Amino acid sequence: MKTVLFLLFYIPFNLLAQFTDDFSDGDFLVSPIWFGDVASFEVDPDYILHLNDSVASTSSLFTSSNALMNGEWIFDVRLEFSPSTNNYAKVYLVTNSTDLLNTEGVYVKIGGQSGSVDDLSLYKQTGTNHTQIIDGTDGLLTNNPDIKVKVTRDDVGNWELFLDTNGVFFSEGTAFDNSIIQSDYFGIYCKYTITRSDKFWFDNFLVNGTVLSLLEYKKSKRILKIIDVTSRESRLKNQPLFYIYDDGTVEKKITID
């Protein structure tokens, strides 16, 4: 009897990944669980997630989310000030780390420009590099933005950014990018001066999508686990025990002597 050790490569399949939170339970620590700079946030009397700090800083919250393929992300943001380079928000649709200084992800940036050109834009982050992939209409978020945002991504990497300021979504642009292939978290990020430290609100998060597709998986093969295979006794020698395939072609053949 022979015992053969081989490596089992991950076989891609799609898993539904979704969550919603309107904070109607008055809490952001359960169902779903948000974590991060929890001392800087509260759910206010109107059941809206509210930044409630008292010093100039940056604060973030995260919740688990694997949604990426065929994804849809919807949320509300209200900023009671005119955004600037020192006062703005980012919503991370996709990130593989809670260290936002060095992560791989995709985020929506609300404001953050100098002058009167603040807009809604979509960015890709790779490590410490930030690349704008959809540039929204300049000037739409110049004064006290109170908006609903929607972002979609299909199964091959086509993104679209939508903005609703008066009850109707309209497109802010499209882009193709399939370089980000993994999500572990959804998150919000606030940068603020002391006078804006309690003037950020977020609500009505709705996230849908699937975890993985074969197309994106091809970029990141990985070993899932090692399995022992015990064969039955056989009089045949030098016959293939099994094959490992890659995209339909034989990659490796294992035989028993």
Predicted features along the sequence, with ranges:
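Short, aromatic/His-centered strand-loop micro-motif at the edge of beta-sheets
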Residues: 125-150
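Carbohydrate-binding surfaces in secreted/extracellular proteins
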Residues: 23, 75-77, 141-174
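Extracellular glycan-recognition surfaces and repeat-rich motifs
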Residues: 19, 27-57
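C-terminal tail/sorting-segment detector
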Residues: 240-257
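Flexible glycan-contacting loops in extracellular carbohydrate-active proteins
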Residues: 87, 172-201
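Extracellular beta-strand elements of beta-rich domains used
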Residues: 23, 200-207
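Secretory/extracellular carbohydrate-interaction modules
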Residues: 52-120
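Residue-level detector of functionally pivotal "anchor" positions at catalytic/ligand-binding pockets or at interdomain
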Residues: 206-234
